[in-house]
């Protein structure tokens, strides 16, 4: 689910998603098509992801950054935060990327990239 509000692109994963390479490629292709060649700061709610694999994470860290100015990831569990922090340090996304448990904090971070 994608929408733009106040210059920020919002994206929410559906519940119980297993993020593998095929899912990552589809999500990125759908987002790029939705954006119609315009770059945005992106708020991505990943609370619906229940599992990932390395190829999916790597794809998002690199190809998933196309047409993004910065990314705020919304997480809700300590396990998600730990895994996501590990992802940020190992995969090294190509745009500024931070984790948040609060949507408002993520929006504040992304406003500087509008």
Can you name each region flagged by the protein language model?
Residues 1-114:
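Amphipathic, Lys/Arg-enriched alpha-helical "gate/interface" segment within cytosolic domains
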């Amino acid at each position: 689910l994608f929408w733009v509000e106040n210059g920020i692109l919002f994206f929410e994963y559906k519940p119980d998603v297993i993020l593998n390479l095929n899912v990552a490629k589809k999500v990125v292709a759908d987002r790029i098509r939705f954006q119609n060649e315009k770059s945005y700061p992106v708020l991505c709610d990943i609370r619906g992801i229940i599992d990932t694999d390395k190829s999916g994470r790597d794809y998002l860290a690199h190809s998933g950054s196309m047409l993004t100015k910065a990314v705020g990831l919304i997480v809700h569990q300590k396990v998600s935060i730990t895994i996501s922090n590990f992802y940020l340090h190992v995969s090294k996304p190509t745009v500024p990327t931070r984790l948040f448990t609060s949507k408002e904090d993520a929006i504040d971070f992304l406003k500087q990239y509008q």
